[in-house]
C-alpha cells in the first residue's frame, strides 16, 4: 500500500466509506478521518508526493479528480464540482494547481 507507515489502513477504509456517495467528499473531514491532519510536515510531504502522480511538484485538477484512488484503487473519482471545490480550497495563489506548501496549509486549516 502506498501509504504504509504513514497512514493506518482502518482509518483509510473509514474515510473512504464516509465519502462513497457522489457529492459527499469534504476534504477537511477526509483529512481528519484518514489521520492526515495530525501528521508531521514530513509525512504530509510524503503523501503529497504520492498524490503528485506526474511528479511535477504540483497536484493539478486531473490528479485531484482521482485523489481517492490514491488511497484505494477501487475508490470513485471525484465529481467535477467536488474537484473544483477541492482545488479552490488548496490553490491559495490562484495558479490552478496545488503546491506542497499549499497542500500542507490546506490539511492543517
From Swiss-Prot:
One of its GO terms (molecular function) is calcium ion binding. This is Parvalbumin beta 2. Monomer. Keywords: Acetylation, Allergen, Calcium, Metal-binding, Muscle protein, Repeat. In muscle, parvalbumin is thought to be involved in relaxation after contraction. It binds two calcium ions. Ca(2+) 2 binds at residues 91, 93, 95, 97, 102. The modification N-acetylalanine is found at residue 2. InterPro entries: EF-hand-dom_pair (IPR011992), EF_Hand_1_Ca_BS (IPR018247), EF_hand_dom (IPR002048), Parvalbumin (IPR008080). PROSITE patterns: EF_HAND_1, EF_HAND_2. Thermostable between pH 4.0-9.5. Average melting temperature (Tm) across all pH values is 60 degrees Celsius. Lower melting temperature in acidic pH 4.0-5.0. Signal peptide: none annotated. Ca(2+) 1 binds at residues 52, 54, 56, 58, 60, 63. The keyword Ion transport does not apply.
Amino acid at each position: 500500500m502506498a501509504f504504509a507507515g504513514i497512514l493506518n489502513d482502518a482509518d483509510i477504509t473509514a474515510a473512504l466509506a464516509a465519502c462513497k456517495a457522489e457529492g459527499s467528499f469534504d476534504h477537511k473531514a477526509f483529512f481528519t478521518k484518514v489521520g492526515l491532519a495530525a501528521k508531521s510536515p514530513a509525512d504530509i510531504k510524503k503523501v503529497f508526493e504520492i498524490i503528485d502522480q506526474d511528479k511535477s511538484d504540483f497536484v493539478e485538477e486531473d490528479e485531484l479528480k482521482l485523489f481517492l484512488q490514491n488511497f484505494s484503487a477501487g475508490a470513485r473519482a471525484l465529481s467535477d464540482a467536488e474537484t473544483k471545490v477541492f482545488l479552490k480550497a488548496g490553490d491559495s495563489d490562484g495558479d490552478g494547481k496545488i503546491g506542497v506548501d499549499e497542500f500542507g496549509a490546506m490539511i492543517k486549516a
